[in-house]
Each structure stands twice: as structure tokens, then as C-alpha cells.
Swiss-Prot record:
Keywords: DNA damage, DNA repair, Endonuclease, Hydrolase, Metal-binding, Nuclease, Zinc. Its EC number is 3.1.21.2. Zn(2+) 1 binds at residues 68, 109, 144. It comes from the Bacteria. It comes from Pediococcus pentosaceus (strain ATCC 25745 / CCUG 21536 / LMG 10740 / 183-1w). PANTHER family: APURINIC-APYRIMIDINIC ENDONUCLEASE, ENDONUCLEASE IV ENDODEOXYRIBONUCLEASE IV. This is Probable endonuclease 4. GO terms for molecular function: deoxyribonuclease IV (phage-T4-induced) activity; DNA binding; DNA-(apurinic or apyrimidinic site) endonuclease activity; phosphoric diester hydrolase activity; zinc ion binding. PROSITE patterns: AP_NUCLEASE_F2_2, AP_NUCLEASE_F2_3, AP_NUCLEASE_F2_4. Binds 3 Zn(2+) ions. Belongs to the AP endonuclease 2 family.
């Protein structure tokens, strides 16, 4: 199983620190943002401590590195040309950072139509990706399945395929399948995951799935809410998520946890990833996990 979580890349250690944290968590893959996900301020590539981090990855036989683009870039905004242009230029540089980090996937929230309608946003996203993607890049841009919150697009497989079809170098595109998002978008990943995969395969092709975001959901299927929950404590449940993590066609696909940190009574937050990864590997749900995370 190729499994890991989102880890921070910050401070003096930058990427080296991300790798160290992932090793402590018992992971063999990791996902990072190249800076804060809520903004686009980024350090120079030479300041990210990539060589030391890559050396440690090799030493510990890590299988994959995934980068996530910040939430705030929106290729789907047709009302503000300056926002579209900024998103294109930022993502061109983000591809360079992801390649320097040796990432296989650059996860991207495709965008929101902000009132213009899905078709207009999809056309804009396609145009933007055609400006960003080059045949020379190594990293694939992984279009994330979205929950349908607000005016998000890519909330169904057909919309994602529309984008892929419109991109010239779509061999450089993949899909990030988020279990919480697809549940909230209305796909029954809990009870009928095989059927969901058959539908995905018919519309897009399973070979396009480059990374799985393995998250439980706080909300019911079809809620369009996008609120992640710790594994086994949401509406999808541990049994289904463990099945997805071990799905035979995903053996070489990284599974990344983005589950929420747990607050103790003093409102201090605790990382869940070490214990969640251990639980996932064991295959046994622990209903005392939240308490253990707080006391870990």
C-alpha cells in the first residue's frame, strides 16, 4: 500500500522537515503545499531544501510525492481576466516547483464558475491548462473531484472528462479522486464503490486516477458540503475506506489522508496521521482513536 498524508512544508527545514514528519507517521508517500494553501507567496526553489529531502526519501524507500496547488487560484473565473491570468502564471511556476521536488502529481481544484455557468468555466479551465502544460514537464496535473460547494465545477465525471478532452497535451493530466468530495457530490462510494469505479472507467478511464485523497465525510451523500472527517468517524465509514485503500487496481496509486486535526478540551490541535495510518494498515477500526490522538 502506498499511503501517506498531507504534511507541512515550512520553517528552516522545509521539504526535509516534511519528509521527517512523514517518516515519523509511518508513511511511504506524502503530500505538501509549496506554501500556505490560502495564499500564493512562495519561496525560491533553492530554499526548499530539496536535495536533503530527496536523499532521505530514497533512504527510507518512499514511493511517491504529491504537491497540492493552493485553493485560491481559479482558472474558471471568466469575469476577472486578471484572476485567470494570475492563475495561469502562478501554476506555470508551480509546475516547475513540483518538478524540482520530484512530485508525480500536482493536485488542482479545477475552478468555480462564479455565476457564469459550468460550461463557461470548463472552457476557461481548458484554455488555462493549454497555456500551462508543456510536453517537457514531468509532473501530471491531477484534476480533483469536487463536492459541488458553491459554484465549483468538476463535480461529476462528465465535467472532468470535458476538461481532459479539451487539453492538447492531456497525457499530462490525471485525476485526484477524493472520497469525501465524491460522496458529497452524490456518488455512493460507501455501498457501491465498484459501481462508481465502473462508471468512472467508462467516462474517463481508471488509468487516469493518479492519486486518492482518502477522507471520511462529516455529511451525507449528495450534501455538496466538503467537510472532511477522521477515518471511520464519518458517513462513509472505515470499512469502505479500508476497501478503497486496498482496491486492487490502485496498488500503485498513492493514497493521501487529509483528515482534520483533533482538538483537545483546551482547543489544542493534534495530528491524527500516525495513528490513522497505523489503523488503516491494521485493517481494524478503533473507536477510541480520537482519544488516543489527543493523548499521543
Amino acid at each position: 500500500m502506498i499511503i501517506g498524508s498531507h504534511v507541512s512544508m515550512s520553517g528552516r527545514k522545509m521539504f526535509l522537515g516534511s519528509v521527517e514528519t512523514s517518516i515519523e507517521n509511518g508513511a511511504n508517500a506524502l503530500m505538501i503545499y509549496t506554501g500556505a494553501p490560502q495564499n500564493t507567496r512562495r519561496k525560491a526553489i533553492e530554499d526548499l531544501r530539496i536535495p536533503e529531502g530527496r536523499a532521505l526519501l530514497t533512504e527510507h524507500d518512499f514511493k511517491d510525492v504529491v504537491v497540492h496547488a493552493p485553493y485560491i487560484v481559479n482558472l474558471g473565473n471568466t469575469f476577472k481576466p486578471e484572476s485567470f491570468k494570475f492563475a495561469v502564471e502562478f501554476l506555470k511556476e508551480e509546475v516547475k516547483r513540483a518538478d524540482a521536488l520530484g512530485a508525480s502529481q500536482l493536485v488542482l481544484h479545477p475552478g468555480s464558475h462564479v455565476g457564469a455557468g459550468p460550461d463557461a468555466a470548463i472552457a476557461s479551465i481548458t484554455e488555462g491548462l493549454n497555456q500551462i502544460i508543456t510536453p517537457e514537464q514531468n509532473v501530471k496535473i491531477a484534476l480533483e473531484t469536487m463536492a459541488g460547494k458553491g459554484t465549483e465545477v468538476a463535480t461529476n465525471f462528465e465535467q472532468i472528462q470535458q476538461i481532459i478532452t479539451g487539453v492538447e497535451h492531456n497525457e499530462k493530466l490525471s485525476v485526484c479522486f477524493d472520497t469525501c468530495h465524491t460522496n458529497d457530490a452524490g456518488y455512493d462510494v460507501k455501498n457501491h464503490f465498484d459501481d462508481v469505479m465502473d462508471e468512472f472507467d467508462q467516462i474517463i478511464g481508471l488509468q487516469k486516477i493518479g492519486v486518492i485523497h482518502l477522507n471520511d465525510s462529516k455529511n451525507e451523500m449528495g450534501s455538496h458540503k466538503d467537510r472532511h472527517e477522521n477515518l471511520g468517524f464519518g458517513t462513509i465509514g472505515f470499512k469502505a475506506l479500508h476497501y478503497i485503500a486496498n482496491f486492487d487496481k490502485f496498488q500503485n496509486v498513492p493514497k493521501i489522508l487529509e483528515t482534520p486535526w483533533v482538538k483537545d478540551p483546551d482547543a489544542k490541535k493534534h495530528s491524527p496521521y500516525q495513528l490513522e495510518l497505523a489503523m488503516l494498515k491494521s485493517g481494524r477500526f478503533d473507536d477510541t482513536l480520537i482519544e488516543k490522538i489527543i493523548n499521543n
